[in-house]
């Protein structure tokens, strides 16, 4: 006991001494680095911060009674401090490092005073909800949605999302925070999964080429229509659509046809006539929208005999049991992969597809994954044939599509991997069997006439009063499709049960007893599909689709692929003009709630009041942010938003009788989607240049506008500019366009530097699309999903797109409307991901959003300042600052060291980073955008990597490293290369792998050497190869 007492006494004395020392030193400031957990930069400027004062009463003193402040009892789970990474002290330090007293001084010097807003204030959520308040608000909204059992069909079906895919892909930031796989060496996992997706599509459709996803089935059909026009070089200007196609698909095609000067004719199959000689293509549905399964063999022969290309819209699940379109001779096949394990989500997002023959591969839209080899001859994957795409070919591109639906394509591919060919066929047979039981039961009841044509999953019923039956079904929480006053269809899916069929029998029996059950009818049901239309050809024969059918195996496969890909889980992704910011967990949570996922897009609006309230609130918030008067939420990608906005401008001019206004002025520095979208709208493009400081040449704009004042339709402009500068003359540019009869279209790609500081409407724009997957936190998903809603001024609001099934328009709705047709297949686009942006805005509040813009600008200027001694910063504003992104110039290194931007980007992989945007908007440069979500420590780490690489370049310039055989040209360095038996590099394996100290504790490893792009396009292979062919390809390489 005595020993214990002495030890306790010593402890008390020691604590008293330490307390005294802490109090003595509390007033003395110390220079301490802002210390991240992973790494403290040896080159980072230091922050002066006082040590925290210990307010705990010393031993033996009486505690003082203190009152509790109101702030102390406010909610602690506020969100802006979790999203905006720079602390107030860091903000001040970084601003001073850039030459300003504080962050506001930097912002005042950067954003032109003439366009600066005083403040931004929301009518709702202005102070911002806490995370727990936001979750409760979303729970309340979800409770206002009513999930009825859907038999509507029309291309949207309920599905079982395998929980292993739900948890490990859809809810996994390692999958959903990846960027489009431009940097192939750190993207091999999702490239493999997307190649799996393409293989699923080619196997099931019977055509050899597929892309890696499109936005939805309607836009896929419209892209196919454009292909038919291009294949025949625009010589035939009529496109025929069979009336058995989904109505939303027909409407999207009609809208798109206007820009191509194509005439769309809708006709019953039996009445289609090619005698005019002017038909470029024909679109049919297989199975039809009302369920019929037809033999198209003779139809296709007849079309081809008349020089007409055949497009077939189809259903992947049906193709597991039906003869594939390729065997009929279809030229192009489109459809949606939604029912392969992707929730309906009130319309999206879903991965569509387009398959075609090798002959038309270079006319295909969208990203295509191909097989190539790396520097060691090992098979590697990459995005193939990029020279077709908008970022290279601009107005000559095959399509304006950029972001597609990669995340959803990966989910659908994994669904096929998990079930395999036998499992998919079993699901299809079950669905067909349930439809057959229902058809047989209705015949036995004798209360309605059932369609006699073969069907797969949809039964067409003739009855005396379709609306009365639909109303009766609604009372049992069942949704049927009403085709007309005497026609109903019921579509079955993998979630349908025998009990559901029994409920349908009761609805049609109108209160009369049903003398049988669905289960009792099952033995009597015959296969409705004739043998001539039954699939005989094999599919999904590759081992990948036949070995991962247990959850353990699929889980390991998913994680094997995931481990190959760099995402925001690993490090910042500083891609200029891409805004790879935080996708917060609270924002993502509602996306997988059944009350949001399980609603059909054509369900009665009164069943989706939670969604509708969110749309209204979001529309109001976006109007406040942008300074516009009305919004359309329908465009389901940025490129779709661009197209919609230009078509709204076109409709406005048409309404005034200005049919001749078709000239669109576009700066040479514009995103590639801008000229591609303008071309799709039938506009004549006139380009204007930039001055030496990267600003749009105002005099060139003036001359172009005045020279075309009678025909001027629009100007497309990005603000801040794609050069990373707030142009002083933007308001003058807008005035010039308006004075000459045009409208100003603002590309919203750089909205992250506007929110709360200025706005498109305040600047003078008439319409703008917002990339919700950039500024407003929807994750990029490895190449989609995205959303591109458009905001407009009052005079353009009447022309916002509507929908043929569920009428829509602007939010808020204008008094008078003359809407466009549908831009997307679903009324509100990819509605399921709108909660992400909604929760982000509502939690940040107006102040948090404004701070986010300021910190994004601060971070970019801090990085530019740190790097300017090592790399030239190409463009700056009038006060020497940059916007939220900046460009470093690497062009000189080609002459001094033989080094190009690609070499720097590949070497950055060895440092654990994704490279910035390469050679755009200026060839030979890198464009860097840090976003507000990245900590100062992460910014410093990336700057240190680039500074270290600059020294590696210097070693080449000094002759200390070989021009051809050096650490940059050899990058990246995967483990397979580093562990090889022989090493012939003039630098060490250790330096190749660990060029920076932070890599010792945590390193992301590229899994392949530098991929050979030329080989991949020269020997194009876009599906999984059998193993023996993989070996042969490697040997030949």
From Swiss-Prot:
Belongs to the GcvP family. It is found in: Mitochondrion. One of its GO terms (molecular function) is mRNA binding. Keywords: Glutathionylation, Mitochondrion, Oxidoreductase, Pyridoxal phosphate, S-nitrosylation, Transit peptide. Residues 1-67 form a transit peptide. It is an enzyme of class 1 (oxidoreductase). The modification S-glutathionyl cysteine is found at residues 98, 402, 463, 777, 943, 1022. PANTHER family: GLYCINE DEHYDROGENASE (DECARBOXYLATING), MITOCHONDRIAL, GLYCINE DEHYDROGENASE, DECARBOXYLATING. Expressed in leaves. Detected in roots, stems, flowers and siliques. GO terms for biological process: glycine catabolic process; response to cadmium ion. It catalyses: N(6)-[(R)-lipoyl]-L-lysyl-[glycine-cleavage complex H protein] + glycine + H(+) = N(6)-[(R)-S(8)-aminomethyldihydrolipoyl]-L-lysyl-[glycine-cleavage complex H protein] + CO2. Its main location: mitochondrion. It holds the Pfam family GcvP2_C. Its cofactor is pyridoxal 5'-phosphate. Homodimer. The glycine cleavage system is composed of four proteins: P, T, L and H. This is Glycine dehydrogenase (decarboxylating) 1, mitochondrial. Its EC number is 1.4.4.2. The modification N6-(pyridoxal phosphate)lysine is found at residue 774. Glutathionylated at Cys-98, Cys-777, Cys-943 and Cys-1022 after S-nitrosoglutathione treatment. S-nitrosylated at unknown positions by nitric oxide. GO terms for cellular component: apoplast; chloroplast; chloroplast envelope; chloroplast stroma; chloroplast thylakoid; cytosol; mitochondrion; plasma membrane.
